[in-house]
Amino acid sequence: SGSCSLKTCWLQLADFRKVGDLLKEKYDSAAAMRISRKGKLELVNNRFNSPTPEDLVYVDPSPDYCLRNETTGSLGTQGRLCNKTSEGMDGCELMCCGRGYDQFKSVQVERCHCKF
């Protein structure tokens, strides 16, 4: 007599926030490389350890996202609203790139069409 067993396997994506946080961490610690005369990648700064296969590396530096750049399509951060109390990416210190920021208070009055 033959017996059957059913086995089901599936892959599931990790939490999106965790993936984003990991990528941001790798981006922030990416290794600067240059191409040697022999056509091989080498570290720009030999004081750092060689990157592992899991590390990010780059040859060209990232553009300055604080400034408007027509070539990359970046609008920059000038004129954007920021959160004064946040230490995250939406916080004024990071988003305004050290340029300082204007503060204002806004009061919005809206009719809510409430019925009692």
Curated annotation (Swiss-Prot):
Which cysteines pair up through disulfides? They are C82-C97
Family, as annotated: Belongs to the Wnt family.
The record describes its post-translational modification as:
Palmitoleoylation is required for efficient binding to frizzled receptors. Depalmitoleoylation leads to Wnt signaling pathway inhibition.
> What are this entry's molecular-function GO terms?
cytokine activity; frizzled binding
Task: Say which species the protein is native to.
Answer: Plestiodon skiltonianus (Western skink)
Gene that this sequence comes from: WNT-5B
Q: Which residues are glycosylated?
A: N69, N83
Q: Name one GO cellular component term.
A: extracellular space
Q: Can you name this protein?
A: Protein Wnt-5b
